Every structure is written in structure tokens, then in C-alpha cells.
């Protein structure tokens, strides 16, 4: 899986709170966005990329991120039931042979860390209450055509 957890820090004084992650090298980042799931649907995923790297940084609350490596068939690019949705430009995956090893990470805004999820992995985001996470990507929208994979929860 090769995911990486980059330690950050927190400084509080009379002026307020400073959250940081000074060891996060952002030279590969090309865009960013934030995610805050709705109370009705606190789970988002499974989403996978063969080429794109994602980094996650907690802005507010607690976010759990499950990471699972692609199964060997998907890594090898074998067709085992891909269904392409041209309207969404996403590939939907047949569940069998799609999974590999897995890990779970808890990101909390009060304990700043950056989670790196390299290509070749699925991720799932579960958020509590009003949690919000910032996501960084190493590609522009549309840069890697057909690199957006979906799996059932």
C-alpha cells in the first residue's frame, strides 16, 4: 500500500491556534479541495486511482480513512468486470479480485497529520458530525483520463 502518515503539530497561545505540518512537501500538488460529508451519508468511498496520489489533512473534527491496496487483477490492468459510465467518466469495479491489504487511519484536527495515499489504492472516508478534511492531488482535473474507479461500500 505504501501509504504514509506525516506528523504535524499544534501550537496554542493567547493569539489562537496554529496547526501545521512542516514535513509535508507540497511540490507535487497541483490542486486541492475540501470534503465534509452530510449527516445523512457520513461515508464516502470506495474510490481508487491507478495514477493519482492524494494527501488528506483534517481541518475540523474527526475523519476516519480506510485504505486498501488494489487486488492483483486491477494492478495488472486485467478486465474483470469494469463497467464504464460515460456520463460520469468513471469506471465501476466488480467487487471480486478488487481488494488487497488494508489499513485504517484516524485524522483529527486537534492532532494534525497528513495522510498520503499513493496510486494503486482504494480509500473510503467516514466523518463524524461537522468534520472536514482538505484533500491535495498531484494531478489536474481530467489529467489522467479513466483513472477514477468506484467500488460498492
Where are these regions (language model features)?
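Conserved metal-binding segment of the jelly-roll/cupin
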Residues: 107-129
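Non-catalytic, conserved peripheral segments adjacent to functional cores
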Residues: 1-71, 75, 100-111, 130-153
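Surface-exposed beta-strand edges and flanking loops
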Residues: 7, 86, 93-95, 109, ...
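Intrinsic disorder/low-complexity segments
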Residues: 69-103
Amino acid at each position: 500500500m505504501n501509504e504514509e502518515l506525516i506528523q504535524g503539530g499544534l501550537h496554542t497561545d493567547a493569539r489562537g491556534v496554529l496547526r501545521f505540518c512542516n514535513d509535508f512537501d507540497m511540490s507535487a500538488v497541483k490542486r486541492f479541495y475540501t470534503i465534509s460529508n452530510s449527516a445523512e451519508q457520513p461515508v464516502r468511498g470506495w474510490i481508487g486511482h491507478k495514477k493519482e496520489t492524494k494527501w488528506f489533512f483534517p481541518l475540523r473534527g474527526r475523519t476516519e480513512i480506510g485504505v486498501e491496496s488494489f487486488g492483483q487483477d486491477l494492478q495488472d490492468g486485467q478486465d474483470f468486470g469494469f463497467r464504464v459510465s460515460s456520463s460520469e467518466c468513471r469506471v465501476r469495479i466488480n467487487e471480486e479480485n478488487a481488494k488487497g491489504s488494508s489499513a485504517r487511519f484516524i485524522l483529527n484536527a486537534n492532532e494534525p497529520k497528513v495522510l498520503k495515499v499513493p496510486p494503486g489504492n482504494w480509500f473510503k472516508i467516514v466523518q463524524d458530525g461537522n468534520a472536514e478534511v482538505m484533500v491535495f492531488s498531484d494531478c489536474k482535473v481530467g489529467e489522467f483520463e479513466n483513472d477514477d474507479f468506484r467500488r460498492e461500500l
